[in-house]
Each structure stands twice: as structure tokens, then as C-alpha cells.
């Protein structure tokens, strides 16, 4: 098992950072604004992901609570959970299977959240590679 400090660092990176950003900027948002949080399919599958999965599960819980908090203000909160994505980091580590999600796919889903009318919110989206996640 990882050390508690490793868990804390992961939570700070994947949950606390979002919490602090939202706390700082929420008062500046007008009705009809959007908040988009990037989770992970590792936060849905509780059987995998270790401390990363724990942190993304916690982010998912935060997104649900934040959505309820923001409803009366007319602010939409979306959680996007990508699966395995072909990023610059993966390109450098190895020539990964190109069946992973492209970052542009993730960008298109995020953009969609901002194209909706103020009366609609894309609450949660899970986007995975067609051939499945790579764990």
C-alpha cells in the first residue's frame, strides 16, 4: 500500500486543487456559467486505480455536491470522465496503442458543455476508447 503522504499528494492534486479554484472563482460566475471538472473512469471503477482512483472517486463526489450547491445560482457543473487517453506523456513513455482516446475527443466533449442552453447541464459523461480502457 502507498504511504499516507502519497495519498495526500494525490488528493491535493486531483481534489483540493479543484476545490480551491472553485472557491476562489465561484463568486465571480454569473447565472448561465459552467464549471467543468475532469475526472477519470478510474473514479467510477472502484476495483482499480489505487490512490489515483480514490482521488477521482472523491472528485466525483465533490462534483455531485457542487452541482447541487450551484443549481440555485443557475451555474451548471459537469464532470467529464475520460478513459485511457493518448497524451504527450504517453507519447514520450512509449509508442502506445493508438486505440486510446485522442485529446481532441475530450476537447469536443468539454466544448459541448458550453454549447448547451442555460437551462441544460451535461451532468456527467464517461468517454472511453472504443476498445476499452487500458489498466
Residue positions per predicted region:
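Conserved active-site helix of classical SDR/Rossmann-fold NAD(P)-dependent CH-OH oxidoreductases
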Residues: 16-19, 56-64, 68, 75, ...
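Short beta-loop-alpha junction of Rossmann-like oxidoreductase domains
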Residues: 48, 75, 79-93
Amino acid at each position: 500500500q502507498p504511504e499516507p503522504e502519497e495519498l495526500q499528494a494525490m488528493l491535493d492534486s486531483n481534489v483540493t486543487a479543484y476545490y480551491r479554484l472553485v472557491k476562489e472563482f465561484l463568486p465571480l460566475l454569473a447565472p448561465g456559467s459552467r464549471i467543468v471538472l475532469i475526472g477519470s473512469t478510474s473514479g467510477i471503477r472502484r476495483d482499480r486505480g489505487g490512490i489515483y482512483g480514490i482521488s477521482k472517486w472523491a472528485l466525483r463526489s465533490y462534483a455531485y455536491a457542487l452541482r447541487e450547491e450551484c443549481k440555485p445560482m443557475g451555474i451548471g457543473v459537469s464532470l467529464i470522465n475520460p478513459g485511457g487517453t493518448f497524451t504527450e506523456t504517453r507519447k514520450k513513455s512509449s509508442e502506445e496503442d493508438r486505440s486510446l482516446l485522442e485529446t481532441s475527443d475530450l476537447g469536443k466533449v468539454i466544448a459541448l458543455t458550453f454549447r448547451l442552453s442555460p437551462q441544460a447541464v451535461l451532468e456527467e459523461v464517461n468517454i472511453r476508447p472504443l476498445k476499452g480502457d487500458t489498466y
